[in-house]
């Protein structure tokens, strides 16, 4: 397990160091939308498997309800990705500039954090929102949800 985490972390660091333009980010997000649309039926099939597993493990009904996907929820996920893709690029934005009495110019600039770790309950929209927001802001994400409910999240 630790070797796997080490590899994930190394890959995330490499990905973080490869800066891409906002235009390319939006192109990738549009491709992400196309992949979700193309694989919508497969995602729903995998989600059904996850629901069966959740029920067999006697998870609470409210968790199962949040886990469940349908065409409307997938449309909502796609809409969220489109909305995020329209955000201005937050990377390298000058937030504040000032000059010290000695003439030194200082600038506060927004930059990516790097690698963000997220642990959450299995919710398909969270998987998509977190990955999309991190990607748009130039960050990498390592996310962990309920391990026995991952088939559809891998697809998303």
Q: Model-flagged regions — what are they?
A:
Residues 148-156:
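Single conserved hydrophobic/aromatic residue that forms the stacking wall/gate
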Residues 145:
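Conserved glycine-bearing catalytic or ligand-binding loops at nucleotide- and phosphate-handling centers
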């Amino acid at each position: 397990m630790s070797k796997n985490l080490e590899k994930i972390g190394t890959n995330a660091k490499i990905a973080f160091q490869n800066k891409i333009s906002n235009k390319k980010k939006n192109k990738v997000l549009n491709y992400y939308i196309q992949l979700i649309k193309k694989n919508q039926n497969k995602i729903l099939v995998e989600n059904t498997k996850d629901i069966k597993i959740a029920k067999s493990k006697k998870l609470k009904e409210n968790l199962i309800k949040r886990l469940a996907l349908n065409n409307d929820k997938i449309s909502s996920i796609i809409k969220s990705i489109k909305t995020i893709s329209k955000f201005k690029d937050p990377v390298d934005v000058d937030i504040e500039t000032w000059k010290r009495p000695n003439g030194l110019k200082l600038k506060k600039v927004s930059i990516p954090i790097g690698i963000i770790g997220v642990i959450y309950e299995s919710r398909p929209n969270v998987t998509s929102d977190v990955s999309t927001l991190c990607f748009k802001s130039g960050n990498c994400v390592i996310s962990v949800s309920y391990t026995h409910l991952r088939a559809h999240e891998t697809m998303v």
